[in-house]
Amino acid sequence: MLNRTILVGRLTRDPELRTTQSGVNVASFTLAVNRTFTNAQGEREADFINIIVFKKQAENVNKYLSKGSLAGVDGRLQTRNYENKEGQRVYVTEVIADSIQFLEPKNSNDTQQDLYQQQVQQTRGQSQYSNNKPVKDNPFANANGPIEIDDNDLPF
C-alpha cells in the first residue's frame, strides 16, 4: 500500500514550535495549495492543509519559514481523532512531513540571503575564493543542437 503526499504552497501562518513530554520538537503550520482548476467565476481556489514536522526539521522550519514562505512538503496523510469538551468525536486529517524544501530565501535572515547571493554569483562564474584562479567555462555552453551519445558511452 502507498501513502505519499507531495505539496507545494505558501504558509498561511508562522510555524508553531513545541516540545513533547519526551523532548521531541514538533512544528505545525498550514500550507495553502492552489487547485489546478478554476471555479465558475474563473478564480483559482486553494486548499488549506495542516502540516506536522518533527525533530531537527521542526527547528529548521521554525527558524527559516514564516507566513507567506513558499515550501515543498513530502510526507504521508494521517487522520487522528479525539473527543472534544462537548463529547463529540472530532476527526483531524494532516500531513506528517518526511521532508520540507525551502523554495525561496528568507529575506529577514541576512545569513541566508548572503548564502543565496553567493550561489547566484557562483552560477554567473564568479568565484567566492580568494585565489583568483579563473573559473572553467561550461564545456557545453556553445553546443548547438542535441548532443549525440552512444549507449556504449553510458556507465550503466
Curated annotation (Swiss-Prot):
Question: Segment Disordered: which positions?
Answer: 107-156
Alphabetized, the UniProt keywords read:
DNA-binding
Q: Where does the record place Low complexity bias?
A: 112-128
Q: Which domain of life is it from?
A: Bacteria
Q: Does the keyword DNA-binding apply?
A: yes
Query: Mind telling me which Gene3D superfamilies this protein's record contains?
Result: Nucleic acid-binding proteins
Record-annotated SSB domain positions: 1-104
Biological process (GO), any one? DNA replication
Q: Please report a single Pfam family linked to this protein.
A: SSB
Any idea which GO molecular function terms this record carries? single-stranded DNA binding
Which Gene Ontology terms of cellular component type are present? nucleoid
Keyword Protein transport annotated? no
NCBIfam families linked to this entry: ssb
Its assembly, as annotated, is: Homotetramer.
* Descriptive protein name: Single-stranded DNA-binding protein
Q: Which source organism does the UniProt entry give?
A: Staphylococcus aureus (strain N315)
